[in-house]
Amino acid sequence: MTSIPISVQGYKALEEELARLKSERPEIIQAIKEAREEGDLRENAGYDAARERQGMAEARIKYIESRMALYQVIDLDTLSGDKVIFGATVDLEDVDSGEAKTYTILGPDEADPSKGSISFLSPVGQALLGREEGDEVSVEIPRGRVTYEIIGVSFKGSKNLG
């Protein structure tokens, strides 16, 4: 069984989501019961919506619970070094356009590119792992092949997260 790194903050967020989803179960069951009492289930939008909500919640609960056993929780405040690893913040420059980007390398269940974090499993994340300042990486992304120069590698810890 392969472990999946996750930050302390990411793990806590998933624990909170799991608790919230479990606490919503009685409310969802009540909504299904009330919709069922309205009669014909074939044309009962309230019933269909409540069942769909239940299915989505149960699927997410099952997913989170199955992942919890695989996580290796890492305290980002204890990391340091010169190489890109899980938890590193990497400053990049697109060699062709000069565009600057900064990413923190996190796990797949906590990465959010819109907030500046990417998964170590993403194409860019995989290309960066093990590299250091001054290295160039070339990676295939949806808009085509791009080459980045690593301008800096730092470890800002948990204060750098959302």
From Swiss-Prot:
GO molecular function, one term: DNA binding
SUPFAM superfamilies, A to Z: FKBP-like, GreA transcript cleavage protein, N-terminal domain
Keyword terms, alphabetized: Coiled coil, DNA-binding, Transcription, Transcription regulation
Family of this protein: Belongs to the GreA/GreB family.
NCBIfam families linked: greA, PRK00226.1-2, PRK00226.1-4, PRK00226.1-5
Coiled-coil features, chain-numbered ranges: 9-38
Superkingdom of origin organism: Bacteria
Disulfide feature: none
Gene that this sequence comes from: greA
InterPro entries, A to Z: GreA/GreB_C_sf (IPR036953), TF_GreA/GreB_CS (IPR018151), Tscrpt_elong_fac_GreA (IPR006359), Tscrpt_elong_fac_GreA/B (IPR028624), Tscrpt_elong_fac_GreA/B_C (IPR001437), Tscrpt_elong_fac_GreA/B_fam (IPR023459), Tscrpt_elong_fac_GreA/B_N (IPR022691), Tscrpt_elong_fac_GreA/B_N_sf (IPR036805)
UniProt-recorded name of the protein: Transcription elongation factor GreA
Cited function: Necessary for efficient RNA polymerase transcription elongation past template-encoded arresting sites. The arresting sites in DNA have the property of trapping a certain fraction of elongating RNA polymerases that pass through, resulting in locked ternary complexes. Cleavage of the nascent transcript by cleavage factors such as GreA or GreB allows the resumption of elongation from the new 3'terminus. GreA releases sequences of 2 to 3 nucleotides.
